[in-house]
Design a protein with these regions (language model features):
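Conserved acetyl-CoA-binding loop-helix of GNAT-fold acetyltransferases
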Residues: 108, 114-127, 154
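Terminal substrate-recognition subdomain of acyl/acetyltransferases
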Residues: 22-23, 163-169
Length: 169
């Protein structure tokens, strides 16, 4: 990673965690993206298609809007070299039934899966939701992502029956 790329990293002190994966240890840092950057835009472009073939990466202007939105938080997992290896979005909102959070777009780079990165991201999202006074956290996941579903269930998420509708505009 060049010096110019390193300048794109958050300025806060490094607080890396050691994750013990199935085959080795892996160091990551989880942080909230608060500024748009080329590094973040590249991560969206590289990782979102791994989540779904239908997803297209946001352009730099959209990344700026996403990061600036007061209703959403973007959590990032970075490897020791600064490379972003995982992303997660948390939407926070208030409705008459209480303050809630919705976790979406959880994706870990295929080359680094199985090392606890997804779990670390979700744990950080749950901690953020608690700090924000959230009473209930919802999470969406594609029906084909069975390994992810097992993780979410191990973490205390419960499947529930619902009819969810979507309409493209």
């Amino acid at each position: 990673m060049s010096g110019a790329d390193r300048a794109d990293l958050p300025k806060s002190p490094p607080d890396f965690r050691i994750l013990r994966g199935k085959t080795n240890e892996f160091m990551i840092r989880i942080y909230e993206a608060t500024e748009p950057s080329d590094l973040l835009a590249e991560a969206f472009a590289r990782l979102l298609p791994q989540l779904s073939e239908r997803m297209t990466a946001p352009d730099r202007e959209a990344v700026a809007r996403i990061v600036a939105s007061p209703a959403t938080r973007q959590l990032v997992a970075a490897a020791e070299d600064g490379r972003i290896v995982g992303l997660l979005s948390v939407a926070l909102y208030d409705v008459p039934s209480g303050r809630k959070a919705w976790i979406e777009d959880v994706v870990v780079d295929a080359a680094t899966r199985g090392r606890g990165i997804g779990e670390a991201l979700v744990r950080e999202a749950l901690a953020l939701a608690r700090r924000e006074g959230v009473a209930r956290v919802m999470l969406t996941s594609n029906a084909t992502r069975r390994a992810s579903h097992r993780l979410y269930e191990r973490m205390g998420f419960v499947r529930y029956e619902t009819d969810c509708f979507r309409r493209d505009l």
